[in-house]
Amino acid sequence: RAWDYLCMNRGAMIYVNKDPKEIQTAIKETRPNMMCAVPRFWEKVYAGVHEKIEKMPGLVKKLMYHAIAVGKKRNLDYVRFNKSVPFSTEIQYKIFKKTLFAKVKKELGLENSMYFPCAGSQLSESVCEFLMSLDFNMVVGYGLTESTATVSCFQPAHKHHDLKSVGEGMQ
């Protein structure tokens, strides 16, 4: 509820999906900028993308996995720790972001993505790494539904965050 109030306060449109089986269709129709989702949703995205990659021809498959590795190296090894990104890594990343990552996001209906709050249970480290490699701005947190209070979260902008945690307590 608190998320809805925040969105309404900022003039955002709110879409409510009543049927979990129709989530892919709903996302492709609405093309959200922001979306709250539980880790299970992102696990299915992770599995679905990997399933499609595995069905690709050999060279394309290798290119996709290389692109993900470059995204991981840039976003998790350098940007997350506020380190300077090597020129070759940055160039490759920018090319992959405009081509392959953009294509994956468009296929998912998430090409307009700004950030995605995620809570409800633990988001696995491998899924979080994958999403951040593709330039999804994940905001992973913990809070009590009963009190609508987020007590901790991390954002990629918070340097040095541990992907196995839900961040630091909010003040």
Where are these regions (language model features)?
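Conserved ATP-binding loop and adjacent catalytic segment of the adenylate-forming AMP-binding
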Residues: Y15, T89-K94, N112-Q171
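Structural motif corresponding to the C-terminal cap of alpha-helices
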Residues: N75, L108, K159-H161
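Generic structural marker for isolated residues within well-ordered, non-membrane alpha-helices
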Residues: W3, F101, C128
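Membrane-proximal helix-turn-helix segments that form the acceptor-binding/catalytic region
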Residues: T99-S113
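Solvent-exposed alpha-helices and their adjacent loops that cap or buttress functional pockets
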Residues: I27, E107-E111, G167
